[in-house]
Amino acid sequence: MTGDVILQISNLTKSFGPVKALKGVDFELRRGEIHAIAGENGAGKSTLMNIIDGILQPDSGEIRLDGTPVEIPSPAAAQKMGIGFVHQEIALCPDVSVAENIFMAATNSSRSFLMDYKGIEAKAREVFAQLSSIDPSVLVRDLSISNQQLVEIAKALTLDCRVLILDEPTAALTEAEAQVLFKIMRRLADQGISLIYISHRMVEIFDNCDRVSVFRDGRYVTTQDVAKITPADVVRAMVGREIGDLYPEKQRPEACSTTEVLRVENLCEAERFHDVSFSLHKGEILGFAGLIGAGRSEIAKGVCALEGQVTGRLWLNGEPLALRDYQDSIDAGIVYLSEDRKGDGVFLDMSIASNVSALKVEQVASALGLIQPGREIEQADRLGRKLNLKCGTLQDPVSSLSGGNQQKVALAKMLSVNPRLIFLDEPTRGVDVGAKAEIYRILRDLAEEGAGIVVISSELPELIGLCDRVLVIHEGCLSGEVSGPDMTEENIMHLASGTQQGTGAASVAAQ
């Protein structure tokens, strides 16, 4: 990382009607550094990045690029200035090749009617030689999400990008894919490219970034070298207060109930998982840990009758249970909250109230089957208050909400059927630390009210901080259980990687 400043922002303001999104923000980016941006949802991060990329125009303030004042009227202008933006949502044309996607980016930035396709293809191959072994002739839809993200980065680099903005780039990546991305980021920084890295994940910020700037309520708070501060310092700056109680208090061992909410025996499904047996007790939050692809989500879906040919036996509150499909599961009070919030968890273009009632619309319908808006609003209002949902009106589309509040709507939809058992897959993915603390409190409250809670997460600190027990899954089988003082990242990773079979305190519970 060099000391010279490539991008400098001074006293930037931006309002949307009466709402002040940016309030005199300052920011500087050095050449060849990886600079993290941290802040809760609504802190102003996205607004600032959209201004840097020319998507939005500031109301006042100054932007300097290489010391020269500039205006960035559009994303095309940003590209010509060497600014690239890889959004969290992939923006590629799936039915054309990698090379054609890059050609389109080049066309948008070119003033010429004639494109140097051979030159662009040569440049693309040169860039991919650095990034990965992606074949430019392959259709984008045939690539994994991680490789599609690399194509987005390649688009920027083929346009001689000097500043690269990455917005939550690991949200859909496996751990191995994320590590590849981090190596590429460092390689680009070593070549003099400056990266702005937006993430809610403190581990990623502290492992891969040089500096971090914190924003809160539309204001710039501080910039620090990551080597000189701690994650707790960043969180404190983000929220303006201590979050010592990020995780609510767990059950005391002597208070643990022996009453089983759920019992699973010998659950199997083809090649996905085998002979899975476990139990969940009243008032308990149970965690599922394991590497990506180990079968965690598939087991949860198997219990909820969302998978195909599943065999095995289930008991709910001591009664045998046979489920033919997910509707049977819902009717029995067992629900599954998908890790893909925007794909399966909520309907972004529908109202908050309609989302909440979507799982069982007959609850808000008349005898003739017509939805009663009054009932729908009443249900959404009751559950919204329970979950501390922050919104304008319940008729607003879910797309208008922050990630944390979208997740609360998805959870309210689950609660609308009065579930006895809730499986939550990556429940805090893409939400800020303040929203995480609220979701953790909600889950603990639900457990104390008698619901069975199973949390699937790739974040080990989350599982350790929230759950009373953690089951570890390796290649479709339960490899062990950890609880109490044995619930450590080291023990979980040993079991998840298959280097240790559970024994004693770190073993599969006797069934």
UniProtKB/Swiss-Prot annotation:
GO cellular component, as recorded: plasma membrane
Recorded hits in InterPro entries, A to Z, give: AAA+_ATPase (IPR003593), ABC_carbohydrate_import_ATPase (IPR050107), ABC_transporter-like_ATP-bd (IPR003439), ABC_transporter-like_CS (IPR017871), P-loop_NTPase (IPR027417)
Offer one Pfam family short name for this entry: ABC_tran
Q: What is its main location?
A: membrane
Subcellular localization, per the record? Cell inner membrane
What membrane topology does the UniProt entry give? Peripheral membrane protein
Known EC number(s)?
A: 7.5.2.7
Q: Which Gene Ontology molecular-function terms are recorded? A: ABC-type D-ribose transporter activity; ATP binding; ATP hydrolysis activity
Q: Tell me, what does this protein do in biology? A: Part of the ABC transporter complex RbsABC involved in ribose import. Responsible for energy coupling to the transport system.
Q: How does it assemble?
A: The complex is composed of an ATP-binding protein (RbsA), two transmembrane proteins (RbsC) and a solute-binding protein (RbsB).
Instruction: Write down what this protein is called.
Output: Ribose import ATP-binding protein RbsA
